[in-house]
């Protein structure tokens, strides 16, 4: 199955991008586990015919020449979902966008490069009410909101929302919305959407 844009993550940032692209006439799909679904944004998207794969998860990315060509999901198995562009909006730790173990912090879907402090003792502040440093971990992107894989930019993958380094819902929703708006603007400027 081929789409113009596949959005991975059905939270606020992912649904903001999906809804705007759908209104612009783009064929989109949203894949989300359902951990942080924004029901207010999902319902109109679904009513207008958006492809919504809730309860499914990406289990493999198929890369070729620095581009993500398709993804395989747990529920669709051998049937890849292809797109010209992909948007990653999976959140941080609670949404499953980042995972931490005793040695590292990593992005579990594609193994994208993550900005994090290697000194585990600096991951937190003992004052529970203080800003927690681990909430600043995430993907660093280029000026076009594209993350990197092993130091190389993935040309057609864009990241927005809490998955980004320095963005946290603790600070308010403005930064999340702004990152989604930036990705939408970039897709629009490239001629991949009309907003």
Cite the ranges covered by each PLM segment:
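Residues forming the flavin
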Residues: 1-195
């Amino acid at each position: 199955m081929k789409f113009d844009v596949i959005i991975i993550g059905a939270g606020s940032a992912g649904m903001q991008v999906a809804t705007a692209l759908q209104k612009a006439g783009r064929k989109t799909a949203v894949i989300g586990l359902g951990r942080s679904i924004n029901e207010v944004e999902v319902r109109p998207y679904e009513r207008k015919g958006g492809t919504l794969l809730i309860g499914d998860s990406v289990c493999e990315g198929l890369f070729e020449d620095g581009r993500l060509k398709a993804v395989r999901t747990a529920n669709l198995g051998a049937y890849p979902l292809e797109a010209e562009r992909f948007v990653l909006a999976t959140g941080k730790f609670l949404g499953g966008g980042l995972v931490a173990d005793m040695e590292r912090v990593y992005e579990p879907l594609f193994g994208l490069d993550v900005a994090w402090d290697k000194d585990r003792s600096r991951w937190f502040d003992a004052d529970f009410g203080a800003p927690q440093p681990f909430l600043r971990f995430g993907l660093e992107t280029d000026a076009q909101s594209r993350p990197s894989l092993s130091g190389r930019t993935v040309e057609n993958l864009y990241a927005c929302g809490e998955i980004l380094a320095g963005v946290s819902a603790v600070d308010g929703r403005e930064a999340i919305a702004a990152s989604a708006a930036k990705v939408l603007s970039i897709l629009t400027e490239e001629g991949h959407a009309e907003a």
